[in-house]
From Swiss-Prot:
Subunit structure: Part of the 50S ribosomal subunit.
Name this polypeptide is given: Large ribosomal subunit protein uL2cz/uL2cy
Family indicated by similarity: Belongs to the universal ribosomal protein uL2 family.
Organism of provenance: Capsella bursa-pastoris (Shepherd's purse)
Entry superkingdom: Eukaryota
Gene this chain is encoded by: rpl2-A
Keyword Zinc: no
Ribosomal protein found in the keyword field: yes
Location of region: Disordered: 224-252
Keywords: Chloroplast, Plastid, Ribonucleoprotein, Ribosomal protein
């Protein structure tokens, strides 16, 4: 893909880049409107998720996470931008006339063919059960529950690795560093999710962040005592505590937040690394 760099005519265009092959004209039968639920508020209007709100209007793209069109070859027709995720999506035209969106695998170009099923080649973009994959395969869009569709490793640049198969389970190393067990009958897609360098992209200005629905993050130490436990003091004052806390007084920065006695506790062999 050709990457075009912006000419530095203003500070906001400095180090900016755009992918020439990525389009933004979705099919009408694969998109639908949705209630704008990204404001970070509940039904009463109370803020439940800070630093969210505003943003450009979005249409949801219907993504095929199940990949259940078995043994039907499809061709990549377009690679498109999706405002609802960091990864790109690509439109697939299947041999039976059906059209679906899937996550764009890294390295896939327009004209490539993909297929899903039980006995398909180990090729980038193909979807098949874990039991049919060799050890060491790089995968994404991994199912946790059989038939529910991919739920793991779906973000831009995400990739997991199949490291072992024993009995009815397969052992995966996830992008977070967590090692866990999953049923061998669950399916996954071969390869890595595309748009790998999205975290290195320069937004250029604060307005670009606001278009994404993200509001400014203010440090608690510069607030007033009524607004945050770290607030108050004259000038640049320390937080006044041994350890930092959240705006509601709970320990922050290091406290484990995972619930105990969770159903998947026995399936996790090694917790994620930070």
């Amino acid at each position: 893909m050709a990457i075009y760099l912006y000419k530095t005519s203003t500070p906001s265009t400095r180090n900016g880049a755009v992918d020439s092959q990525v389009k933004s004209n979705p099919r009408n039968n694969l998109i639908y409107g949705q209630h704008h639920c990204g404001k970070g508020r509940n039904a009463r209007g109370i803020i439940t998720a800070r630093h969210r709100g505003g943003g450009h209007k979005r249409l949801y793209r219907k993504i095929d996470f199940r990949r259940n069109a078995n043994d039907i070859y499809g061709r990549i027709v377009t690679i498109e931008y999706d405002p609802n995720r960091n990864a790109y999506i690509c439109l697939i035209h299947y041999g039976d006339g059906e059209k679906r969106y899937i996550l764009h695998p890294r390295g896939a170009i327009i004209g490539d063919t993909i297929v899903s099923g039980t006995e398909v080649p180990i090729k980038m973009g193909n979807a098949l059960p874990l039991t049919d994959m060799p050890l060491g395969t790089a995968i994404h869009n991994i199912e946790i529950t059989l038939g529910k569709g991919g739920q793991l490793a779906r973000a831009a640049g995400a990739v997991a690795k199949l490291i072992a198969k024993e009995g009815k389970s397969a052992t995966l190393k996830l992008p977070s560093g967590e090692v866990r067990l999953i049923s061998k009958n669950c399916s996954a897609t071969v390869g890595q999710v595309g748009n790998v360098g999205v975290n290195q992209k320069s937004l250029g200005r604060a307005g670009s962040k606001r278009w994404l629905g993200k509001r400014p993050v203010v440090r608690g130490v510069v607030m007033n005592p009524v607004d945050h436990p770290h607030g108050g003091g004259e000038g640049r004052a320390p937080i006044g505590r041994k350890k930092p806390v959240t705006p509601w007084g709970y320990p922050a920065l290091g406290r484990r937040t995972r619930k105990r006695k969770k159903y998947s506790e026995t399936l996790i062999l090694r917790r994620r690394s930070k």
